[in-house]
Swiss-Prot record:
Signal peptide: none
Name of the gene: bpt
Species, as recorded: Burkholderia cenocepacia (strain HI2424)
Keywords tagged on the record: Acyltransferase, Cytoplasm, Transferase
SUPFAM superfamilies named in the record: Acyl-CoA N-acyltransferases (Nat)
Listed name of the protein: Aspartate/glutamate leucyltransferase
GO aspect biological process, one term: ubiquitin-dependent protein catabolic process via the N-end rule pathway
Length: 276
């Protein structure tokens, strides 16, 4: 691959990176967070985004970012190497339990039934967090705007007698990268208790990546201290981006001292340096 510095007019070399103002961390109480943002967003196509994800970036709509927090390295980008993945007994049970769900993959699009499920999910799982009051426009900006190769996956029960669509159970947004699938966001029926739909969704993505010949499923950030993120450590082996390198993680022994230099200012794709 030609180094991007040899292509001064390439989209990668044209990207700029800046740090946001501090804001309250949404994962750890009492922490202050910052993000490093890649701009301009219209230059970030699927190839560029693949390289950014390898460097620990994620996206929210067309906003591409990674943690850039002073004195904190709690957010660890993680991915599952699908060729080595070994499901646990519990995960095998979840796969068997939900394998009758019908998955339909389509381009990103608005659907009133999806939005209604999203609002029920937010009200039940994240009440008071702000997202439970998202308007349709906010929902679309968050999940349905993308400049890369993105897909919407809906999971339903089998069609009812008479041909009526089965009950909608879960909706997931994924990005298709050059080296894997990236899990963007998933929401599901909150009234179905103890279903582990989220676990099943990741297992489904792992199987899809295998079928497409892609080596990884990127799961976003894992935070050891956050109960919401604990499930990601249940997928083995799990690789994390530590000090600019992807390494196999032992979630029980990972050493993450409160030093921001290595992660927050890790090298950027194409040899860029982070900005303060």
């Amino acid at each position: 691959m030609t180094h991007p510095t040899e292509l001064p007019l390439s989209p990668l070399s044209a990207l700029q990176f800046y740090a946001t103002a501090p804001y309250p961390c949404s994962y750890l109480d009492g922490r202050i967070a910052r993000s490093q943002v890649a701009t301009p967003s219209h230059l970030i196509n699927s190839d560029i985004y693949t390289e950014l994800v390898k460097a620990g970036f994620r996206r929210s709509g067309v906003f591409t970012y990674r943690p850039y927090c002073d004195g904190c390295r709690a957010c660890v980008p993680v991915r599952v190497p699908v060729g080595e993945f070994a499901p646990t007994r519990t995960q095998r049970r979840m796969w068997k339990r939900h394998r009758a769900l019908v998955a339909t993959v389509s381009p990103l699009h608005y659907d009133e039934e999806h939005y209604a499920l999203y609002m029920r999910y937010q009200s039940a799982r994240h009440a008071g967090g702000g997202m439970d009051r998202d308007s349709r426009d906010q929902y679309e900006q968050f999940l349905l705007q993308s400049r890369i190769n993105s897909r919407l996956v809906e999971f339903r029960d089998l069609d009812a007698p008479g041909g009526e669509p089965g009950k909608l159970r879960m909706v997931s947004m994924i990005d298709i990268l050059g080296d894997g699938l990236s899990s963007v966001y998933t929401f599901f029926e909150p009234d179905d208790r103890h279903t582990s739909y989220g676990t099943y969704n990741i297992l489904w993505q792992i199987e899809q990546a295998k079928s497409l010949g892609l080596p990884y499923v990127y799961l976003g950030y894992w935070i050891r201290e956050s109960p919401k993120m604990a499930y990601k450590a249940n997928f083995h082996p799990l690789e994390g981006l530590i000090d600019g390198r992807w390494k196999t993680l032992d979630p029980e022994r990972i050493d993450l001292p409160p030093v921001d230099a290595a992660l927050a200012r890790a090298p950027l794709p194409g040899g860029h340096s982070g900005s303060g």
